Design a protein with these regions (language model features):
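Short, charged/polar connector segments at secondary-structure boundaries
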Residues: 1-119, 123, 129-130, 175-188, ...
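Periplasmic-binding protein-like
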Residues: 357-366, 385-387, 475-485, 505-513, ...
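Flexible loop/hinge segments that line or gate small-molecule binding clefts
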Residues: 377-400
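Segments of small-molecule ligand-sensing domains
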Residues: 529-655
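Short, well-structured alpha-helical segments in soluble
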Residues: 343-359, 463-475
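Extracytoplasmic "Venus flytrap"
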Residues: 301-320, 324, 337-343, 431-435
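An alpha-beta-alpha
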Residues: 321, 409-449, 539-559
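Hydrophobic alpha-helical segments within soluble ligand-binding/sensing domains
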Residues: 399-421, 512-533
Length: 655
């Protein structure tokens, strides 16, 4: 490169610096490079570790170690000083050297929280950034902050754990647990090192994802390229992604854009507690329609994990499907697919339903969420809903019911009917909402008998004695059993029942899922335009329908043998809960450790109920963790367990 050419390049770089300087001043921000020494004044440092020579992504070099050179550079590392200065002459010389033979001398810098601050070699970095180089070699010293429980420090400590395995700084994330998930997605064990080939493959894919993400405006979002790459690896194999063309990669990211936006939120799920109101057509829209007309005929598909003959759960949803046929006769056509197995035929069955013309697809098991998400990405005009809770995927919607409302009422019935102060409770999985169900039942029982105690037994634990045998031996005669009949078990052994002398079971009451009402509400919302109005919205959060008794999708069936006074109490409670006049959790709640969880002056918010992970002091028993469960129960916990997000990556669910 000729000197005159290098002088011209300096002038261009200086203009970039001056532009950045003006923009930062306009927005009240510092126009200079951040200084690590200033940053560390308010940081407790654990230690400093020499890392030796490291290939540093140039975009992660963000500042200087000391304040000595800050006035020479704008915050984008472009030069600010006059061309005729000694600084300008050295920059020009480095520019010529870079173009002619490359800058070979490593810089000296400090790394703090994944960002690099230059001690020696600022001008080299400036030249390399100007020419948009990908990386720079540096002799690095790592500054380790003292551990605390902030998400940023937790994530950084996680990175430090995995850095010896992955040996790259380029992959950055915003969510704790991401490095472990990446390790799993790469097919590696928790402590298995990457090969050079592994690193080359993932960094090549990273570069293509970065280009696609940036083209879609991702550089303006909080979610990193690493976040998006990990999202893709949740849905597609490494082989599928590496074979995809740049255009195909961009199409995949574009199709997942709602899910990318959901990554922006610390809480990616918004809960809808009641059906959307019908859309009101404005006068202008009547004269000149602005939005597409609502459909007049719908095809609705149901994908079930099992059959009605082998699963009462599937039978209940099928009963709801037939309600659609009768309520929307001539407007809605429904069809069902059975025995959908994740990883085998689930994706194919959903694709078959869509090929058959399905406008709406309901998948009725949490295990089908991965297949649902992949189909939603491939068919963005098809409305796909999965029966589950707290799934952070905005491309689909999820749905379940507020069972705790019904459990509160059956708890009051149990408290009134129990001959002693002890009542049995059988729970299946420690999933989202289940501790709330148990506590609501206990609070209902305590409302009519302040001495009531709930004996909790789980069906998901290994080598457990039959709960009914335990209750009978302890003299417990009223039990809240499973919420639906189970093949091979007595028909009466669900809901809340009384154990009579001789072991005869008498129904008292049971929670009832009116799935037909839910499906009817969803179809109505599509036909009248309400579906669009209750979309996740501009914040990009996933929608979880969590409807209760006020929507008609949840109820309590009372036995005809229930004493009339107790039935009268149950109806009063049902009316109060449905009208919103009675809140099961609007009372003083103390947990098993004596901690007051609610003073009683107000109820609990939705997040507190969904994520409840404690038992109130009226309950005798514990909430099992993942490692306590049977092998058969663990897949459900991976999907819906209350501490699902705390599982190590190797134990997380595979979509």
């Amino acid at each position: 490169m000729l000197r005159n050419e290098a002088l011209e390049e300096y002038g261009k770089a200086q203009k970039l610096g001056q532009k950045d300087y003006r923009e930062k001043m306009l927005h009240g921000q510092s126009p200079f490079l951040p200084v690590l020494d200033d940053i560390l004044q308010n940081v407790q440092v654990e230690n400093q570790l020499p890392l030796g020579l490291v290939e540093i992504p140039i975009k992660l070099v963000v500042g200087t170690k000391t304040a000595g050179r800050t006035a020479a550079f704008a915050s984008n590392f472009m030069p600010l000083l006059d061309l005729n200065s000694e600084f300008g002459s050295k920059w020009v010389a480095l520019c010529m050297a870079h173009v002619d033979e490359g800058i070979r001398d490593p810089i000296r810098c400090f790394e703090y929280m994944g960002r690099f601050y230059v001690q020696e070699g600022n001008k080299r970095v400036s030249v390399l950034k100007y020419f948009e180089a990908g990386s720079v070699t540096g002799n690095v010293t790592r500054v380790v902050p003292k551990y605390n429980d902030t998400p940023e420090v937790r994530l950084y400590y996680e990175f430090m754990h995995y850095y010896p395995l992955i040996q790259t700084y380029l992959l950055t994330f915003t969510k704790p647990g991401s490095y472990g998930r990446l390790q799993k997605a790469m097919g590696k064990g928790p402590e298995e090192k990457w090969t050079a080939e592994d690193r080359a493959a993932i960094l090549s894919l990273y570069n293509w994802v970065e280009k696609a993400y940036t083209a879609l405006g991702g550089d303006k979002l909080r979610a990193t390229v690493g976040d998006v790459l990990l999202l893709l690896l949740r849905l597609y194999s490494m082989e599928e992604l590496t074979k995809a063309s740049p255009n195909e990669l961009q199409q995949k990211i574009d199709a997942l854009w709602d899910d990318v936006l959901a990554l922006q939120n610390d809480d990616p799920v918004t809960v809808s507690e009641k059906p959307a109101e019908p859309a009101q057509t404005k006068l202008l829209e009547r004269i000149l329609p602005i939005h597409p007309a609502a459909p007049t005929h719908l095809k609705v598909a149901f994908i079930h994990e099992r059959t009605p003959e082998t699963s009462s759960w599937t039978s209940q949803h099928e009963f709801g499907r037939t309600q659609l046929d009768s309520v929307f006769e001539g407007k809605v056509e429904t069809f069902a697919y059975f025995n959908a197995v994740p990883g085998r035929n689930a994706d194919l069955l959903i694709e078959a339903a869509i090929s058959h013309g399905a406008d709406i697809v309901f998948t009725t098991s949490p295990k089908l969420v991965g297949a649902s998400l992949r189909s939603a990405v491939n068919h963005p005009t098809v409305r796909i809903l999965n029966c589950s809770m707290e799934m952070p995927y905005a491309s689909i919607r999820t749905y379940y019911t507020r069972v705790y409302e019904a459990k509160f009422i059956t708890g009051a019935i149990a408290g009134a009917m129990a001959g002693t102060d002890r009542i049995g409770y059988v729970a299946d999985y420690p999933s989202f909402g289940v501790p709330a169900n148990i506590n609501a039942f206990a609070l209902g029982a305590r409302m009519v008998n302040p001495r009531a105690r709930i004996e909790l037994r789980w069906t998901c634990l290994p080598d457990q004695e039959d709960p009914l045998a335990v209750f009978t031996r302890k003299g417990i005669t009223v039990v809240s059993g499973r919420d639906a009949p189970v093949p091979g078990r007595p028909q009466q052994e669900f809901g809340t029942f009384l154990i009579r002398p001789g072991g005869v079971l008498q129904d008292l009451a049971t929670p009832f899922w009116h799935w037909g009402q839910f499906y009817e509400n969803v179809v109505h919302s599509v036909l009248d335009g309400g579906w669009v109005r209750d979309k996740s919205g501009t914040d990009g959060r996933a929608v979880n329908y969590w409807w209760g008794m006020n929507s008609g999708v949840m109820d309590v069936l009372l036995s005809r043998e229930l004493p009339s006074d107790v039935a009268h109490l149950a109806r009063i409670l049902r009316t109060g809960v449905t009208a919103g006049m009675i809140d099961p959790f609007a009372c003083r709640i103390t947990d098993q450790n004596g901690t007051v969880r609610n003073s009683g002056r107000h109820g609990l918010d939705v997040e507190q109920i969904v994520h409840m992970d404690y038992l109130c002091d009226a309950v005798d028993g514990t909430i099992p963790e993942y490692d306590d469960l049977t092998e058969q129960a663990r897949p459900m916990y991976r999907m819906q367990g209350i501490h699902r997000d705390q599982l190590p990556a190797e134990k997380e669910a595979t979509l």
